Amino acid sequence: ALDAVGLDHSLHVFPNIAEPDLVARITLKPERDQDSDWLIKLDAIHKRKTVRAGFRDKPLPVDYLIESAADVSTEHAVMCVNCDPECEFEVLAAVQQADSIWSADKHFMRENASWMHPLRKRSRDGVPARSTKLPSSKELWSAPMQFLGSGERRTLTGAVLTDRDAPMDWANSGIVLSNMLNKVAGRGIGAALMSHPLFLAPTHLLIKESLKTESIPQILVRFGYPERSPATPRRPLVDVMLHPGFGR
């Protein structure tokens, strides 16, 4: 977004080890001419939505998603797209298994609900849920949604993988995920996100085995063309950014 408006910048992730809550420092540099490629990406940011109302019956460009995943991957984090139907089915089954376990955990459900609320004065943490209907994992992660009648892919699952599981790896995963979501948004493709199964040892192991990887899956993604839904609620900039002009 900064590049699109002609502002060059540098990004330093975890600039101060003594301040773990300071995830990144952005330093603005002198203005420069706008980049047409970044204007396209800025448009994609506006179009990007988390899938909240299901997927449309429209075939996905599988090769494009594979190429995009390769483009956004780095030496620190890899965007993996799962094209094997059997493996994908196993991942989806693990998601449903984890959902059943978590749904029976009252403490988890209470904590999860506390992170999705409209009262921003009470807490700045979490997701500004407002009155938007939250997506159900059973709706967005059910196995029968994989294929169209023609055999073409209606949805495709993926994951962001890292070699380690430390704060720097989480940040690098977020960067790769953001780049992937912005890239495919330009083609009208959305994504549902899921991480809860990765917090349970049994389903975490099942997902690693299904993806046939020794790397650590940080977040699961399911790509597809989204049904129409309200824009994803966003937190105000002042909630997540420190600046001399912002008060907290």
Question: At which residue positions do the language-model features occur?
Answer:
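Acidic, surface-exposed loops and disordered segments
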Residues: 1-248
